[in-house]
From Swiss-Prot:
This is Protein pbn1. One of its GO terms (biological process) is GPI anchor biosynthetic process. Disulfide bonds: none annotated. Glycans are attached at N409. Residues 1-503 are lumenal. One of its GO terms (molecular function) is mannosyltransferase activity.
Length: 543
């Protein structure tokens, strides 16, 4: 197992060298204030058999989990996904789809939640959706996609502790337990590297900062890299500038300054000093697809009340969110939102894909660019086998001639499916917040290569070209899931009687209507049959 631990401090955060003390066996940290990313990489041989068997059926498997709590996505960890569990999967060729999905669904349920809406049907399409690929050049986009709300990662922690960590590996057990407090977790596997990578991200340090002793592995075979980094304003708009200190625990005898260049696990070269004096760390820059925005670039989500069966999602943004991002001068930018909707709620793709300017202007929409998943307008929720749908919408912004209001509202009309009856006459439907971002075309000639912190397979970034830069708006609420109260058929004594009466009344009306139609058809047939007879009788009398 290889570990990479990165601390990123804000430019104004103080730091002194006595907060990081490197010894031959460990790095002792004290009161580090900043975001933390921890990455563990396992070879397939290190994994339990039940996990490696499933991975061997995957060409690529990417899991993204984001907390329902609001958190800061600081550079270079600026990208976001909607709250919950996201799975992006491409199977290998050569084995049946039923076996692939059966083993994958079973693994997802054991590792995350046995209540996941992931069955083992005959085809992948009955549980996973197929995302649209608008940018064919973005080859890393997975073939199938899945989502489910998942408030906690308690099951994943237990799975790692019991299946991956040995009982004597205290560092592995401690890392697994720390996942409970993570703001986001990524899991990646591809058949080329044959390695599984688990990344956890914590946007805030504990009350007294990060205090930890990061020790080298007892066997001395597993590498542990630690970076203490900071960000500064970059010269080029597509770049992120960073600098700081590095150490390989158990190998280096002092913290190393960063120098320019991007080799190694961190993407930087090592530069050792010849004495104990410390100069300012050398800064380095690299192009990044995901860029930060100021803290006041926020958005909020709400639904009109009462929601009924046709709720309207409102995305509200202050004027600071409508300012064009600091993209290259020749870049073209547009504001977008990417909705991840569970099966209980959906949009009307025919309505949202309209080009009617009156409809679009009334909702401050520009266009629906992509939709995938369940869009059946009539099916109740219990008839829908797949998890839900995704929607990519371009949002309108005030023109330069318009006076910018204190709050710019974008409205998206949605629809709720019929849910199963309940005793109260209502059921709850949970809707995760969408992500809202600016998408800007990068300058011609910009090499958007993979940087050490790059994050791909988020679902929405694969719908754009490879030279697109993204600027994420920050959600403003403490909880990023909306709870809707959905009216359903009531199942208490009175409601049950009423439901039976309604069913009986409906059957009577249908029966009477059918008899009336048959009676009318019979009358028409009888009258059309008697007319020729009357004509022939009259003709005989005249003769």
């Amino acid at each position: 197992m290889r570990r990479r631990i990165t601390f990123v401090q804000r430019p104004e955060t103080p730091f002194s060298l006595d907060q990081a003390v490197l010894t031959p066996d460990a790095l002792a940290l004290h009161g580090i204030d900043g975001a933390r990313e921890e990455r563990a990489t396992f070879s397939v041989d290190e994994l339990p058999e039940e996990l490696s068997d499933v991975l061997k059926q995957c060409h690529q498997l990417h899991v993204r989990w984001a907390s329902e709590r609001r958190y800061d996505a600081v550079a270079p960890f600026s990208s976001r996904v909607s709250p919950g569990l996201h799975v992006f999967y491409t199977p290998v060729d050569g084995s049946s789809e039923e076996n692939k999905l059966k083993s994958l669904c079973a693994l997802l349920k054991r590792a995350f939640d046995y209540g996941l809406k992931c069955k083992s049907p005959e085809t992948l399409e009955e549980s996973f959706i197929t995302p649209p690929i608008l940018s064919t050049r973005f080859a890393s986009t997975a073939a199938f996609q899945y989502h489910s709300l998942l408030p906690t990662l308690d099951n994943l922690v237990a799975y790692i502790e019991n299946k991956i960590c040995s009982s004597s590996d205290e560092q592995c057990l401690r890392y697994a337990a720390s996942i409970r407090s993570a703001d986001s977790v990524d899991i990646n596997y591809d058949s080329i590297s044959h390695s599984l990578t688990v990344l956890g991200y914590w946007s805030q340090s504990p009350k007294n900062g990060w205090t930890d002793e990061i020790r080298r592995h007892a066997a001395g075979t597993d590498q542990v890299e630690v970076g203490l980094l900071g960000t500064e304003a970059a010269t080029e708009p597509e770049d992120i500038k960073m600098g700081g200190l590095l150490a390989v625990v158990g190998k280096d005898d002092q913290l190393s300054m960063l120098s320019s260049g991007l080799p190694s696990e961190f993407g930087v070269a090592y530069g050792y000093g010849t004495d104990d004096s410390w100069a300012e760390p050398t800064l380095f820059s690299f192009p990044s697809r995901h860029q930060p925005l100021p803290e006041d670039a926020t958005y909020s989500i709400s639904f009109t009340s009462p929601t009924g069966l046709h709720p309207t999602m409102t995305i509200s943004m202050p004027p600071s969110s409508l300012n064009s991002p600091p993209a290259p001068p020749d870049a073209t930018c547009a504001l977008h939102t990417y909705l991840t909707l569970p099966s209980t709620i959906f949009g009307d793709k025919y309505q949202l894909s309209t080009t009617d300017p009156l409809f679009l202007d009334s909702h401050n929409l520009v266009a629906l660019h992509a939709v995938a998943g369940e869009t059946d307008l009539e099916a109740p929720d219990w008839f829908v086998s797949r998890w839900g749908s995704n929607w990519l919408l371009e949002l309108a912004t005030p023109s330069e001639s318009d006076q910018v209001p204190e709050e710019w509202n974008v409205t998206i009309p949605l629809h709720l499916r019929y849910l199963r009856p309940s005793e109260s006459g209502y059921r709850s439907a949970s809707v995760p917040w969408p992500v809202v971002f600016w998408a800007c075309t990068a300058e011609d000639g910009t090499k958007m290569g993979v940087n050490p912190f790059d994050r791909v397979n988020l679902g929405w970034e694969g719908l754009f070209g490879t030279r697109t830069m993204f600027y994420q708006l920050h959600p403003s609420s403490d909880r990023l899931v909306e709870e809707l109260e959905v009216p359903v058929l009531q199942l208490d004594d009175k409601g049950f009687f009423q439901s039976k009466a309604i069913e009986l009344g409906t059957m009577i009306v249908i029966g009477l209507g059918s008899l009336w139609v048959l009676w009318k058809l019979g009358a028409i047939a009888w009258s059309s049959g008697t007319r020729p007879q009357r004509k022939s009788t009259k003709q005989k009398k005249s003769e």
